């Protein structure tokens, strides 16, 4: 996916968000976000992007579709702060590079271990770091959308009890789907889509 675009708010690359703040600010921000974060409508199951399918061949354990925990997490102040921290950390540590320049192929989804990647690689890295921090895999969805210019763009969606939030390499802000301005979406099909909707306390899981 050729999604290496111009920097937005000082962040270079393609998908997922964040900023540090004192506890009081984080609490107020989380409260406001909870009021305006709708769920993305679940449409018919679509075929997974070829890049995701190939990624799951190479990293099969990370694509296990067996639901082990409910998909939604409780958006506590701690969880909100962690989302923002990880989003910013990945956005600032990875530099944008197209798959053709990086791998010599038109499309490849992989981790930006060498410090370079395009939008889906940012999203994959954020997903990986969140899972390592204890977030349930079933709450972290890879999505392909149309950006503001009508181009294909990959991003990470985090499902919470307060709505769905987008971690995007084009901004350091964690936004609700409604606030991104993106159009359409393809949810990765390699995920059990109808897991129980009882919330999981992300803060407890993150505490490990």
Language-model-detected regions and their locations in the chain:
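Helix-centric, low-specificity signal for extended rod-like, repetitive segments
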Residues: 1-2, 25, 119
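N-terminal secretory signal peptides that target proteins for export/translocation
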Residues: 1-9
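Short hydrophobic "helix-edge" motifs at membrane interfaces and signal-peptide entry regions
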Residues: 10, 19, 49-51
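Bacterial N-terminal signal peptides
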Residues: 13-26
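A structural boundary/capping signal
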Residues: 30-208
